[in-house]
């Protein structure tokens, strides 16, 4: 900071957790538990006395999509970020919907198994975070070998059918939860982010399974 302070007017930080951007407070830090219940802005201003703002990473992504990206033309929608967990944001009347306690869109906590509402094994973040992708691929291959996301999609793009089956199962689960979000919130669009969202195969398979849900719904519902 010292080296560039004469050129810096402000600082904006996108971070995980339930964040109150109005006062710069992190109720939680998401997976970064060591910053729970901290006023991050006050701490940073002790070292960097400039204008500083913080925001939940998925909500920051949603603001970017509303202002400059794929959600410029919608009033109501959602953002789903596939990463370590599941980042999420709801968009209402062309604005990020934070909720009364700044926790709207915390999709990581969504339960995917109504028969077990306790175990983290069935949280959306567990099933469809990057670890969930690895587990679906391992199950399909019948192995415990570790792979990175890059290695998984390299194998898929080379035509490994078992890997593609694992990715497809992962995408089926993602599509099911996106369907649930859509049915609850009546989204015009859902933007998918996160590093693996750059993989065309992932988006193709999510769309395929999303369409399949509607094809078998038996009712006319806005899509």
Question: What do these predicted ranges mean?
Answer:
Residues 1-10, 19-23, 46-50, 67-74, ...:
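ATP-binding/phosphotransfer module of carbohydrate and carboxylate kinases, centering on a glycine-rich
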């Amino acid at each position: 900071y010292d080296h560039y302070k004469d050129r810096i007017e402000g600082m904006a930080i996108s971070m995980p957790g339930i964040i109150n951007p109005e006062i710069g407070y992190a109720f939680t830090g998401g997976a970064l538990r060591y910053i729970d219940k901290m006023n991050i802005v006050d701490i940073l201003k002790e070292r960097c006395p400039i204008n500083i703002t913080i925001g939940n990473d998925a909500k920051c992504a949603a603001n970017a999509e509303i202002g400059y990206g794929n959600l410029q033309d919608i009033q109501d929608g959602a953002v789903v970020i596939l990463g370590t967990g599941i980042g999420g944001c709801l968009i209402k009347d062309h604005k990020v919907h934070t909720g009364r306690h700044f926790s709207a869109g915390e999709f990581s906590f969504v339960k995917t198994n109504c028969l077990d509402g306790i175990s983290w094994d069935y949280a959306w973040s567990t099933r469809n975070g990057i670890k969930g992708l690895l587990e679906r691929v391992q199950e399909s291959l019948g192995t415990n070998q570790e792979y990175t996301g890059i290695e998984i999609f390299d194998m898929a793009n080379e035509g490994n059918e078992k890997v593609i089956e694992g990715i497809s199962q992962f995408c089926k689960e993602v599509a099911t939860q996106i369907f649930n979000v859509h049915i609850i919130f009546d989204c015009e669009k859902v933007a998918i982010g996160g590093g693996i969202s750059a993989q065309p195969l992932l988006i193709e398979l999510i769309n395929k399974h999303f369409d399949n849900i509607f094809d078998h719904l038996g009712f006319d519902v806005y899509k």
